[in-house]
């Protein structure tokens, strides 16, 4: 979301089966005839992603839910679970065409309701937690335009602070990581 780069971060591909199993709730949100974004299961029926991911960049309109599919644990051309989207709830302050910079980033959130729940016991939804404090370390797992077939694990991302209601951290993010 905010491309701050730090060479000290350890970045690795989630290729070890034991390591990848911890992150099966992270997946790709695919748009038919479009792109993709990182998305995360936050309940058996709900996925969190960036709001801009569900808009058509050419028209500025929200894409039809029929064009969206969540692929949990996507790696090497396969997912652990495939789910179509039933409905979309975009953050009320988000405007695809009317915002830029940190104002846009702070409200760039959407919750997608799946048509059917993901009930597998090995795919555990992430809980939504409080924002970590400055100085804390977090991990970021995401896909991006240059690594669309397997997520990357960014370990040791340090929280640098907050600016205009946006968490700023030391990890590199790229298109698709949202």
Feature roles, as predicted:
Residues 19-22, 41-42, 61-64, 102-106, ...:
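Extracellular/periplasmic catalytic domains that process cell-envelope and extracellular macromolecules
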Residues 106-109, 114-176:
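Chymotrypsin/trypsin-fold serine protease catalytic domain
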Residues 27-29, 65-76, 136-142:
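Short conserved beta-strand and strand-loop elements enriched in small hydrophobics
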Residues 24-69:
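Catalytic histidine site
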Residues 1-42, 152:
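Protease-domain processing segments flanking chymotrypsin-fold serine proteases, especially trypsin-like
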Residues 33-36, 174-178:
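Short, small/polar residue-rich loop motifs at catalytic or cofactor-binding pockets
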Residues 29, 39, 45, 49, ...:
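Terminal peptide-recognition signature
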Residues 8-21, 55, 61-118:
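Conserved catalytic-core segment of clan PA serine endopeptidases
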């Amino acid at each position: 979301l905010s491309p701050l780069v730090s060479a000290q971060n350890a970045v690795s591909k989630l290729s070890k089966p034991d390591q990848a199993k911890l992150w099966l709730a992270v997946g790709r949100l695919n748009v038919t005839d479009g792109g993709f974004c990182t998305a995360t299961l936050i309940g058996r029926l709900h996925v969190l992603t960036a709001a801009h991911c569900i808009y058509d960049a050419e028209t500025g309109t929200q894409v039809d839910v029929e064009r969206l599919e969540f692929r949990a644990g996507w790696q090497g051309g396969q997912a652990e679970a495939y789910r179509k989207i039933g409905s979309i709830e975009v953050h009320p302050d988000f405007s695809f065409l009317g915002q830029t910079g940190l104002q846009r980033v702070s409200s760039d959130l959407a919750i997608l309701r799946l048509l059917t729940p993901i009930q597998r016991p090995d795919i555990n939804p992430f809980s939504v937690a409080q924002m970590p404090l400055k100085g804390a370390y977090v991990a970021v797992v995401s896909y991006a335009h240059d690594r669309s077939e397997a997520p990357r694990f960014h370990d040791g991302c340090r929280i640098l602070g907050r600016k205009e209601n946006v968490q700023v951290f030391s990890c590199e993010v790229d298109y698709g990581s949202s």
